[in-house]
Every structure is written in C-alpha cells, then in structure tokens.
C-alpha cells in the first residue's frame, strides 16, 4: 500500500530493493541539522528516570515553554506530538455546525475531524494565480491566497482550521491576514508546525494573541525543526478552560520521560536555533534555483523547510524511478486531492544531498 505520509522508509526500501538506511529521504520535512546535541545529552542524562512514571503535568517542560512564550503554565499543554493535540482540536471543531478547512490540507486534519464526525467545508487556495512564466525569467512568487467559502451556518457557529506556514505550499501568511477571522469564527485552530523555521524578525505566530482570544488554539511541533519525529512531542497553546477539558479526556502520561527531557533541552538551545535560521534560507534558495532550471519542473517559493513542485511528468512515475534508480524518496501529493499526480514535495536537506536530488531529477526528466 502506498504511504499516506512522508518518511515511510520501509515502503521506499521495498520499492527500491535496498535497505531503509540506503534511502535518501526528501519526503519527510525534517531538518537535517538535528537532533541537537542538547537533545542527545538530555536523553542520556534521564535514562535512569525510566523506572519512574513521568510527571503527569510535565512541569519542567511547561515552565521552560512559559519562559519562551511569556505565558503562565495553564496556557500550555504538552502532547504526544502535535498530532495528538490536533485530535482534541478536531473534537472541539466537530461540536460546531461546520469546520472550514483551507485546502490542500495535511491528511491528518481530515482524520482528526472525521474521527468526531465534523462537517467539513473546504476552502481551496487559488494556486492558479501563481506566475508560471519560468521561460521569461520571471521569478515565480508564492502569492497563493484563500477565500473562505461562506458557511451554511453563520461564522459564529463555525470553526476554521489552517496551518501557517502552509503545508504543502510553504506559503507564509502575515498574522494580519488571519486576525480578522478571530473576530468571526467560534473557534480558530492554527497549526504552526513549521513556524520555528522562521527567525524572530520574520515569524508570524499568533501566540501573542492567544490571551486576547479565547477562541484561538495554536498547535506547535518539536518534530520538524529539532529533528525529533521518533520521540513524538509537541504542545498546544490555548485558553486554560479548553486545555483542562482536553486533559480530562486524554490518556495519562501522553509524553514519555525521554521525549519530555529532550524537548525541555532543545527549546532552550539558542545555538542550534541560530544555526538553523542561518542555514535554511541560502540552502533552500539553492535548491529552488536548481529545481527551476530542470525542464518540466516549477517550484513554489516557500517560507518553510520544503518546496512544493509542479511537474509535467506524473509524479507517481517520477517517484518510482527515483527510488529504483537512485534510492531517493520524494513526497508525492496523491493524498492532497486538489494537487494529485502533477505535484510533489521535497524537504530541504544538505547542499550535497540536494545536489544529488537535482542530478537525479535532471537525468530522469531529460531522458524521459
């Protein structure tokens, strides 16, 4: 069965006829710089704690996050990755008349909403407004916009689920774009899983607004930026009453001891954060330029650590060839109905790895 998410190395290895370790994975949008040394040190230091249950309130991690975001502890809830917290956001959205979802959307949003029988209304991005004149030398800007479909019920009876930066396009919306919806909707859930990739002077987080708007929920992931997908840790920021309701219904000890220790360390790792912010823009730009020069490929500009690419060649076929001939895995977009088989997504990796991808794509597109 084809994977729904990126990072399925077992499937990729079976397709390529090699071991999972031989796969160069561009399908999962994980930073190649991590995990930080601080995470490894924290895990080693807490191995002796495996004999005890975790602190159910995760006070050490929560207190550190409070310092980072200038909030009191009751406004923050650590979770088993942002996916677990998305489930509870889906539970709240399903209580409303409708849940408006900006599409194309991460497949897990549908899971979380359908789990509680939410009525989903899609609001598609206008991807066709992009400048496609690559041949004229005009840079293709990511100016994609969205116009919300009018709900069948009033806005005050409906909820909105959006991510910023947007996955899979990489579009970053200014906070002023989203703020008006906080006055209109009963609930606004903003997934900021990729916001950490932007330095403080560029990020557009709505966390500073959460105390003003009790209908605002922010989801944050520590998976992508800190390269910790195997540990499963993230957190939600929302009104204490809402988070307390979630806590009463979730499983106990959702975050294991080692994940909590690593998370506590990395959010204080200023050196890793700074090096990541310095690394990403030039490396992403080099990959963007390389993709732009390959016939039949049209990348979108991105504020995140990945690039969405439109392809003249069916991407399912391209993915198979990359695996079988080069042991490289890209993320097809078949799980995004609005995109289908003419788009793929690639993570930004090291310059050497990016060059390997570009050479393989050039070979496959020019020889086909």
Language-model regions: role of each:
Residues 1-52, 158:
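N-terminal "arm"/small-domain region of PLP-dependent enzymes with the aminotransferase-like
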Residues 36, 215-293, 298-300:
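PLP-dependent aminotransferase class I/II
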Residues 60-99, 116:
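Phosphate-binding glycine-rich loop
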Residues 80, 101-118, 253:
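Substrate-binding/gating loop at the entrance of the active-site cleft, primarily
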Residues 121-130, 141-200:
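Active-site phosphate-binding strand-loop segment of PLP-dependent enzymes
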């Amino acid at each position: 069965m084809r994977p729904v998410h990126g990072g399925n190395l077992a499937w990729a290895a079976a397709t390529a006829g090699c071991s999972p370790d031989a796969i160069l994975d561009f399908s999962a949008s994980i930073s190649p710089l991590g995990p930080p040394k601080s995470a490894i040190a924290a895990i080693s230091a807490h191995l002796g704690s495996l004999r005890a249950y975790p602190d159910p309130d995760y006070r050490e991690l929560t207190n550190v996050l409070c310092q980072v975001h200038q909030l009191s502890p009751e406004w923050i809830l650590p979770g088993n990755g942002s996916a677990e917290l998305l489930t509870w956001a889906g539970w709240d959205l399903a209580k409303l008349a409708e849940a408006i979802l900006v599409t194309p959307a991460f497949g897990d949003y549908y899971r979380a909403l359908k789990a509680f029988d939410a009525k989903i209304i899609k609001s598609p991005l206008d991807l066709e407004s992009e400048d496609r004149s690559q041949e004229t030398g005009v840079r293709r800007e990511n100016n994609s916009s969205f116009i919300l479909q009018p709900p069948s019920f009033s806005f005050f009876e409906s909820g909105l689920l959006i991510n910023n930066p947007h996955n899979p396009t990489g579009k970053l919306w200014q906070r002023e774009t989203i703020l008006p919806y906080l006055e209109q909707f009963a609930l606004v859930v903003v997934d900021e899983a990729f916001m950490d990739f932007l330095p403080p002077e560029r990020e557009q987080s709505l966390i500073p607004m959460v105390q003003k708007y009790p209908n605002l929920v922010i989801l944050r992931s520590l998976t992508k930026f800190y390269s910790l997908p195997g540990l499963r840790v993230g957190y939600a920021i929302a009104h204490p009453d809402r988070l307390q309701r979630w806590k009463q219904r979730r499983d106990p000890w959702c975050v294991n001891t080692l994940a909590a220790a690593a998370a506590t360390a990395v959010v204080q790792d200023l050196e890793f954060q700074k090096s990541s912010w310095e690394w990403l823009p030039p490396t992403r730009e080099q990959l963007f330029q390389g993709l732009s020069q390959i016939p039949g490929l049209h990348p979108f500009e991105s504020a995140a650590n990945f690039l969405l690419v439109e392809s003249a060649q069916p991407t399912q076929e391209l993915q198979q060839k990359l695996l079988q001939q080069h042991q490289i895995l890209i993320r097809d977009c078949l799980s995004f109905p609005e995109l289908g088989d003419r788009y793929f997504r690639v993570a930004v990796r090291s310059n050497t790895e990016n060059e390997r991808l570009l050479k393989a794509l050039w070979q496959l597109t020019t020889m086909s």
